Regions:
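Single conserved hydrophobic/aromatic residue that forms the stacking wall/gate
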Residues: 1-11
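Conserved ATP-binding module of the ATP-grasp superfamily
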Residues: 12-46, 103-112
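ATP-dependent carboxylate/phosphate-activation module, predominantly the ATP-grasp catalytic core
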Residues: 49, 56-101, 137-151
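Short acidic-glycine loop/turn motifs at beta-strand connectors
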Residues: 51-55, 126-130, 222-223, 239
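Active-site "cap" helix and flanking loop/linker of ATP-utilizing ligase/carboxylase catalytic domains
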Residues: 98-120, 137-211, 221
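Generic C-terminus detector
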Residues: 219-223, 227-275
Length: 275
Protein backbone atom coordinates (compact mmCIF):
# COMPACT_ATOMS: atom_id res chain seq x y z
CA UNK A 1 0.00 0.00 0.00
CA UNK A 2 1.42 3.39 -0.96
CA UNK A 3 1.73 6.06 1.71
CA UNK A 4 0.65 9.27 0.02
CA UNK A 5 1.27 11.68 2.85
CA UNK A 6 3.31 11.65 6.02
CA UNK A 7 3.49 13.78 9.13
CA UNK A 8 5.75 13.36 12.09
CA UNK A 9 6.24 14.54 15.63
CA UNK A 10 8.62 13.78 18.50
CA UNK A 11 6.98 12.75 21.77
CA UNK A 12 8.61 11.90 25.11
CA UNK A 13 5.62 9.88 26.36
CA UNK A 14 4.29 7.14 24.08
CA UNK A 15 0.78 7.18 25.59
CA UNK A 16 0.56 10.92 25.03
CA UNK A 17 1.67 10.38 21.44
CA UNK A 18 -1.03 7.79 20.74
CA UNK A 19 -3.70 9.98 22.34
CA UNK A 20 -2.61 13.09 20.43
CA UNK A 21 -2.49 11.38 17.04
CA UNK A 22 -5.19 8.70 17.17
CA UNK A 23 -7.75 10.15 19.59
CA UNK A 24 -7.32 13.92 19.34
CA UNK A 25 -6.75 13.55 15.57
CA UNK A 26 -3.95 16.14 15.44
CA UNK A 27 -3.22 15.00 11.87
CA UNK A 28 -6.79 14.09 10.94
CA UNK A 29 -7.38 10.73 9.26
CA UNK A 30 -3.66 10.48 8.53
CA UNK A 31 -3.33 9.51 12.19
CA UNK A 32 -5.37 6.33 11.79
CA UNK A 33 -2.11 4.50 11.12
CA UNK A 34 1.13 5.20 12.96
CA UNK A 35 4.75 4.18 12.56
CA UNK A 36 6.73 4.42 15.79
CA UNK A 37 10.47 4.87 15.42
CA UNK A 38 13.35 5.12 17.83
CA UNK A 39 14.47 8.68 18.54
CA UNK A 40 18.21 8.89 17.97
CA UNK A 41 20.84 11.54 18.59
CA UNK A 42 24.34 11.90 17.20
CA UNK A 43 26.26 13.29 14.28
CA UNK A 44 24.88 12.66 10.80
CA UNK A 45 27.22 11.46 8.06
CA UNK A 46 26.46 10.80 4.40
CA UNK A 47 28.16 7.98 2.51
CA UNK A 48 27.67 7.53 -1.24
CA UNK A 49 28.31 4.25 -3.04
CA UNK A 50 28.34 2.59 -6.46
CA UNK A 51 26.53 -0.77 -6.82
CA UNK A 52 26.41 -3.28 -9.70
CA UNK A 53 23.91 -5.69 -8.16
CA UNK A 54 26.54 -7.72 -6.31
CA UNK A 55 29.53 -5.52 -5.56
CA UNK A 56 29.43 -2.23 -3.66
CA UNK A 57 32.19 0.38 -3.77
CA UNK A 58 32.12 3.11 -1.13
CA UNK A 59 32.95 6.71 -1.97
CA UNK A 60 34.36 9.25 0.45
CA UNK A 61 32.22 10.36 3.40
CA UNK A 62 30.59 13.78 3.62
CA UNK A 63 28.69 15.88 6.16
CA UNK A 64 25.72 18.09 5.25
CA UNK A 65 24.16 21.18 6.85
CA UNK A 66 20.37 21.00 6.54
CA UNK A 67 19.16 24.04 8.47
CA UNK A 68 18.77 27.37 6.70
CA UNK A 69 20.43 29.55 9.33
CA UNK A 70 23.78 29.81 11.07
CA UNK A 71 24.10 27.69 14.18
CA UNK A 72 21.74 25.09 12.69
CA UNK A 73 18.74 27.38 13.15
CA UNK A 74 15.71 27.90 10.94
CA UNK A 75 13.86 25.52 8.68
CA UNK A 76 15.18 22.38 7.05
CA UNK A 77 16.42 22.78 3.49
CA UNK A 78 17.78 20.59 0.73
CA UNK A 79 21.24 21.36 2.11
CA UNK A 80 23.13 24.62 2.63
CA UNK A 81 26.64 23.23 2.36
CA UNK A 82 28.80 20.22 3.02
CA UNK A 83 32.35 19.00 3.48
CA UNK A 84 34.31 15.85 2.70
CA UNK A 85 35.73 13.75 4.19
CA UNK A 86 33.98 13.74 7.56
CA UNK A 87 36.54 13.51 10.40
CA UNK A 88 33.90 11.68 12.44
CA UNK A 89 33.69 8.83 9.94
CA UNK A 90 36.60 6.95 11.50
CA UNK A 91 38.21 3.66 10.48
CA UNK A 92 36.23 1.99 13.27
CA UNK A 93 32.95 3.35 11.89
CA UNK A 94 33.95 2.33 8.37
CA UNK A 95 34.73 -1.24 9.43
CA UNK A 96 31.40 -1.56 11.26
CA UNK A 97 29.41 -0.26 8.29
CA UNK A 98 31.22 -2.49 5.81
CA UNK A 99 30.54 -5.51 8.01
CA UNK A 100 26.91 -4.86 8.96
CA UNK A 101 25.39 -2.26 6.61
CA UNK A 102 26.80 -1.76 3.11
CA UNK A 103 27.19 -5.24 1.64
CA UNK A 104 24.28 -6.50 3.74
CA UNK A 105 21.99 -3.97 2.05
CA UNK A 106 23.04 -5.07 -1.45
CA UNK A 107 22.75 -8.77 -0.58
CA UNK A 108 19.29 -8.30 0.97
CA UNK A 109 17.91 -6.60 -2.14
CA UNK A 110 19.33 -9.34 -4.36
CA UNK A 111 17.83 -12.02 -2.10
CA UNK A 112 14.41 -10.37 -2.49
CA UNK A 113 14.74 -10.42 -6.27
CA UNK A 114 15.37 -6.66 -6.35
CA UNK A 115 18.96 -6.63 -7.59
CA UNK A 116 20.03 -2.99 -7.50
CA UNK A 117 22.41 -1.22 -9.86
CA UNK A 118 23.33 2.41 -9.49
CA UNK A 119 23.94 4.79 -6.60
CA UNK A 120 23.02 4.15 -2.98
CA UNK A 121 23.16 7.07 -0.57
CA UNK A 122 23.50 5.95 3.06
CA UNK A 123 22.31 8.55 5.56
CA UNK A 124 23.95 7.50 8.81
CA UNK A 125 23.77 8.71 12.38
CA UNK A 126 26.73 8.02 14.65
CA UNK A 127 25.00 7.23 17.95
CA UNK A 128 26.45 6.12 21.27
CA UNK A 129 25.31 2.60 20.34
CA UNK A 130 27.16 2.75 17.03
CA UNK A 131 26.27 3.74 13.45
CA UNK A 132 22.58 3.56 12.51
CA UNK A 133 20.93 3.98 9.10
CA UNK A 134 18.53 6.94 8.98
CA UNK A 135 17.70 6.76 5.29
CA UNK A 136 18.54 5.28 1.93
CA UNK A 137 18.41 7.20 -1.34
CA UNK A 138 18.90 5.76 -4.82
CA UNK A 139 20.78 8.84 -6.03
CA UNK A 140 23.73 11.11 -5.41
CA UNK A 141 23.21 13.57 -2.57
CA UNK A 142 23.00 17.30 -3.25
CA UNK A 143 25.25 18.99 -2.14
CA UNK A 144 27.20 15.87 -1.06
CA UNK A 145 28.12 15.00 -4.64
CA UNK A 146 29.68 18.45 -5.05
CA UNK A 147 32.42 17.61 -2.52
CA UNK A 148 32.79 13.88 -3.19
CA UNK A 149 33.01 13.67 -6.99
CA UNK A 150 35.64 16.45 -7.41
CA UNK A 151 37.95 14.34 -5.22
CA UNK A 152 37.38 11.11 -7.18
CA UNK A 153 40.30 10.10 -9.41
CA UNK A 154 38.35 7.64 -11.57
CA UNK A 155 36.46 8.45 -14.75
CA UNK A 156 32.81 8.62 -13.67
CA UNK A 157 31.53 7.18 -16.96
CA UNK A 158 33.76 4.10 -16.63
CA UNK A 159 32.51 3.50 -13.09
CA UNK A 160 28.86 3.85 -14.10
CA UNK A 161 29.37 1.48 -17.04
CA UNK A 162 30.86 -1.04 -14.62
CA UNK A 163 27.71 -0.72 -12.49
CA UNK A 164 25.58 -1.50 -15.55
CA UNK A 165 27.77 -4.37 -16.77
CA UNK A 166 28.26 -6.00 -13.37
CA UNK A 167 32.03 -5.51 -13.42
CA UNK A 168 32.40 -3.09 -10.52
CA UNK A 169 34.70 -5.57 -8.76
CA UNK A 170 37.31 -4.73 -11.42
CA UNK A 171 37.27 -1.01 -10.57
CA UNK A 172 39.87 0.35 -8.14
CA UNK A 173 37.94 3.32 -6.77
CA UNK A 174 40.36 6.03 -5.65
CA UNK A 175 40.04 9.47 -4.09
CA UNK A 176 42.50 12.32 -3.67
CA UNK A 177 44.14 12.68 -0.25
CA UNK A 178 42.71 16.13 0.32
CA UNK A 179 39.44 17.80 1.31
CA UNK A 180 36.59 19.76 -0.25
CA UNK A 181 33.96 22.18 1.08
CA UNK A 182 30.81 23.38 -0.68
CA UNK A 183 28.90 26.52 0.33
CA UNK A 184 25.45 26.96 -1.19
CA UNK A 185 24.47 30.41 -2.42
CA UNK A 186 20.71 30.71 -2.02
CA UNK A 187 17.98 33.27 -2.63
CA UNK A 188 17.22 35.22 0.54
CA UNK A 189 14.00 33.85 2.03
CA UNK A 190 14.64 30.24 0.99
CA UNK A 191 13.09 27.75 1.75
CA UNK A 192 9.83 29.71 2.14
CA UNK A 193 9.38 32.77 -0.08
CA UNK A 194 12.00 34.33 -2.28
CA UNK A 195 12.34 36.41 -5.42
CA UNK A 196 14.14 35.22 -8.54
CA UNK A 197 15.25 36.56 -11.89
CA UNK A 198 18.29 38.48 -10.62
CA UNK A 199 21.35 38.65 -12.86
CA UNK A 200 24.35 36.69 -11.54
CA UNK A 201 27.77 38.35 -11.77
CA UNK A 202 31.27 36.88 -11.48
CA UNK A 203 30.81 33.37 -12.87
CA UNK A 204 33.74 33.87 -15.25
CA UNK A 205 36.11 33.86 -12.26
CA UNK A 206 35.87 30.07 -12.10
CA UNK A 207 37.22 29.54 -15.61
CA UNK A 208 40.61 27.79 -15.56
CA UNK A 209 40.51 27.26 -11.77
CA UNK A 210 41.52 23.65 -11.09
CA UNK A 211 40.54 23.53 -7.41
CA UNK A 212 37.42 25.70 -7.55
CA UNK A 213 34.00 24.72 -8.91
CA UNK A 214 30.69 26.52 -9.41
CA UNK A 215 27.76 24.09 -9.67
CA UNK A 216 24.53 25.51 -11.08
CA UNK A 217 21.20 24.66 -9.43
CA UNK A 218 18.49 27.34 -9.48
CA UNK A 219 19.73 29.28 -12.51
CA UNK A 220 18.42 30.11 -15.98
CA UNK A 221 19.99 31.38 -19.18
CA UNK A 222 18.41 34.55 -20.58
CA UNK A 223 19.43 36.99 -23.34
CA UNK A 224 20.76 39.29 -20.60
CA UNK A 225 22.81 36.50 -19.01
CA UNK A 226 22.41 33.85 -16.31
CA UNK A 227 19.81 34.74 -13.67
CA UNK A 228 18.57 33.20 -10.43
CA UNK A 229 15.68 30.78 -10.88
CA UNK A 230 15.25 28.92 -7.59
CA UNK A 231 15.92 28.72 -3.87
CA UNK A 232 19.33 27.12 -3.96
CA UNK A 233 21.09 28.96 -6.77
CA UNK A 234 24.74 27.86 -6.87
CA UNK A 235 27.05 25.46 -5.07
CA UNK A 236 30.54 26.93 -4.59
CA UNK A 237 33.09 24.16 -4.01
CA UNK A 238 36.79 24.45 -3.28
CA UNK A 239 39.48 21.91 -2.50
CA UNK A 240 42.39 22.20 -0.10
CA UNK A 241 45.10 20.10 1.49
CA UNK A 242 42.84 19.72 4.54
CA UNK A 243 39.32 20.67 5.63
CA UNK A 244 40.30 24.03 7.12
CA UNK A 245 42.09 25.13 3.96
CA UNK A 246 39.21 23.91 1.78
CA UNK A 247 36.73 25.86 3.91
CA UNK A 248 38.84 29.02 3.67
CA UNK A 249 39.07 28.63 -0.11
CA UNK A 250 35.34 27.96 -0.52
CA UNK A 251 34.31 31.07 1.41
CA UNK A 252 36.82 33.15 -0.52
CA UNK A 253 35.25 31.91 -3.76
CA UNK A 254 31.74 32.84 -2.60
CA UNK A 255 32.87 36.48 -2.82
CA UNK A 256 33.57 36.08 -6.54
CA UNK A 257 29.84 35.77 -7.23
CA UNK A 258 27.12 38.34 -6.60
CA UNK A 259 23.38 38.70 -7.19
CA UNK A 260 20.79 40.94 -5.58
CA UNK A 261 19.33 38.64 -2.90
CA UNK A 262 22.34 36.40 -2.30
CA UNK A 263 22.18 34.46 0.96
CA UNK A 264 24.44 31.83 2.52
CA UNK A 265 25.35 30.31 5.83
CA UNK A 266 28.63 31.54 7.30
CA UNK A 267 29.40 28.48 9.44
CA UNK A 268 29.60 25.61 6.96
CA UNK A 269 32.17 23.17 8.30
CA UNK A 270 31.95 24.44 11.90
CA UNK A 271 32.23 20.81 13.06
CA UNK A 272 35.73 20.70 11.56
CA UNK A 273 36.96 22.67 14.56
CA UNK A 274 35.32 20.19 16.95
CA UNK A 275 36.98 17.09 15.50
Amino acid sequence: KAIRRQRQMCIRDRKEGVRTIMEDKKFGNAGNTMVIEEFMTGREVSVLSFVDGKTIKIMSSAQDHKRAGDGDTGLNTGGMGTFSPSPFYTEEVDEFCKKYIYQATVDAMAAEGREFKGIIFFGLMLTQKGPRVLEYNARFGDPEAQVVLPRMKNDLIEVMEACINGTLDQIDLQFEDNAAVCVVLASDGYPVRYEKGFLIHGLERFEGQDNYFCFHAGTKQTPEGIVTNGGRVLGITAKGKDLKEARKNAYAATEWVSFENKYMRHDIGKAIDEA
